[in-house]
Amino acid sequence: MKTELKKFGTTLISRQNGREAFAAYRPQLSTLGDNETLELDFEGVITFSTSWGDEFLSPLVKQYGSRLVLSHTENLSVKATIELLEKINQLPFNRNIPTENKS
């Protein structure tokens, strides 16, 4: 299952907004298969705060572990926040680093 986080906005800030986004997203998780990957795509996200990420990503990485894959994390705000959340939670995020498209 792939979710584009920009559907929650391009500026993902505040603990309250992260909590509300997770509450709105949670029902969609019931359709995730037992062996299916959950991909969160950060393409288009401009600002990503630690408080929003803690409310949205932390419960997901604790529940899904390596099945949670983060893509398009090159933005400095996104990258720094993910690295900080890894230190706080002492859990690594699985990042899908895009490879060059050779058509």
What are these regions (language model features)?
Residues 17, 52-53:
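Residues at alpha-helix caps and immediate loop-helix transition turns in enzyme cores, especially N-
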